[in-house]
């Protein structure tokens, strides 16, 4: 396993969308989570969303954005076979560092169980 944690771009959308669809019960909204919706989100927040990649395959993702004051982590997920290896934590750390670089210190996590 050779996992890379990096900033998400719209080029990652197909892999991220496939990951979302692979997770049972994952809440996807057709407008917000469409390619167009995610593109708008990433353009507004170009440095804060994160993916985890193993040999070119997206195995984790976080949509992360802020309004200048508060940050929010959305769609935090790791593929089933990659869980319990610290990948989720590493992605959260990278997203939090990106928020800190933009002087955002209040963060909310949106989670569905």
Which residue ranges define each predicted feature?
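Acetyl-CoA-dependent GNAT
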Residues: 3, 7-75, 79, 92-94, ...
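Glycine-rich beta-to-alpha transition loops that act as phosphate-gripper elements at the mouths
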Residues: 32, 112-113
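A short, internal acetyl-CoA/4′-phosphopantetheine-binding micro-motif in the GNAT/acyltransferase core
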Residues: 76-83, 111-112
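Residues forming the Rossmann-fold NAD(P)(H) cofactor-binding site
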Residues: 85, 89, 93
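Conserved GNAT acetyl-CoA-binding A-motif
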Residues: 99-111
């Amino acid at each position: 396993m050779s996992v890379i944690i990096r900033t998400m771009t719209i080029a990652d959308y197909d892999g991220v969308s496939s990951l979302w669809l692979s997770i049972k019960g994952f809440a996807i909204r057709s407008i917000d989570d469409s390619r167009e919706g995610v593109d708008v989100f990433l353009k507004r927040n170009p440095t804060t969303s994160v993916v985890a990649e193993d040999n070119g395959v997206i195995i984790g993702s976080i949509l992360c954005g802020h309004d200048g004051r508060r940050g929010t982590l959305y769609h935090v997920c790791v593929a089933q076979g990659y869980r319990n290896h610290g990948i989720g934590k590493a992605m959260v750390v990278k997203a939090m560092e990106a928020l800190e670089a933009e002087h955002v210190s209040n963060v909310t996590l949106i989670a569905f169980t």
